[in-house]
Amino acid sequence: MKNFLESLIENNRQYVEHGKLASYIPELEKANKEDLGIYIVTLDGKEVGAGEYDKKFTIQSISKVITLMLAILDNGKDRVFSRVGVEPTGDSFNSIVSLERKPSKKPFNPMVNSGAILTTSLIEGDSEEEKFERILEFTRKVTGNDDIQLNEDVYLSEKETGDRNRALAYFMKSNGVIEGNIDDILDLYFKQCSLEVNAKDLARFGAMLANDGVLPWNGERVISREICRIIKTIMVTCGMYDDSGKFAVHIGIPAKSGVGGGIMAAVPRRMGIGIFGPSLDDKGNSIAGTHVMKDLSEELDLSIF
């Protein structure tokens, strides 16, 4: 398997040249565009990686899956989905247009920025610090890594350049869609996106989802089978931004990407996959990472469809 993964990485490394580093968060531009790595955790206990799988990067939008799970655990699925929809959108992940044209004014789904900000606002805690600590601890639990920390530089960079997210949040506030102190909610959102992970962490997270909400390494149930099914369904329809339909057709695996270059994927009852490749396509997904996923899916027949 290791030789197979190494060949996948080398065969697809050429695609990094066709992408760009995320530029709207200055700190993310410091990444090495050439990096590409993959890690796989199978449900029968095998772990194998190739390329830059142990290199740290920020989780970015993959954190939206974590906060969605936490919000559902805190509030129940009915309350969460009364506030945010589950419909895919053809607009970009930070679009304001989609909020304006929707009669209910609630965000389309929890994987676009507006929906994720609203989801974060539903997480319980007596203070912003307590809420962040809960997100951090939950992230450590689902990745099996107690050493995950906040990248302070990326957090400050996000905070400094997050005007589009502020616009989304205040637009929702003006329509009565979101409650609470907007500055505190956004600060929490910027922090959750700035947690440092590697491809191995993402693969272990994916393995938990592939295992119907149970951590494969210790048998602990983190979320119910039903919540896990909902999460994976939303990942299929909305997880790869406005490229989700194409990804479902050609690759067919529940996955979530982030502009830090990560892809977290879950092949039900088989494996979790973590990818790192910070060179992005025009949708904000890892360009070489997506090619790796396509080859992996075809070679191992991983599509759920």
Swiss-Prot record:
EC code: 3.5.1.2
Pfam families documented for this protein: Glutaminase
Molecular function as annotated in GO: glutaminase activity
Subunit structure: Homotetramer.
Entry-linked InterPro entries: Beta-lactam/transpept-like (IPR012338), Glutaminase (IPR015868)
Enzyme class: hydrolase
Gene name linked to the record: glsA2
PANTHER family: GLUTAMINASE
GO biological process, one term: glutamate biosynthetic process
Organism the protein comes from: Clostridium perfringens (strain 13 / Type A)
Annotated substrate binding sites: 61, 113, 158, 165, 189, 241, 259
Database matches in NCBIfam families: Gln_ase
Stated family: Belongs to the glutaminase family.
SUPFAM superfamilies from the UniProt entry: beta-lactamase/transpeptidase-like
Annotated protein name in UniProt: Glutaminase 2
Protein keywords: Hydrolase
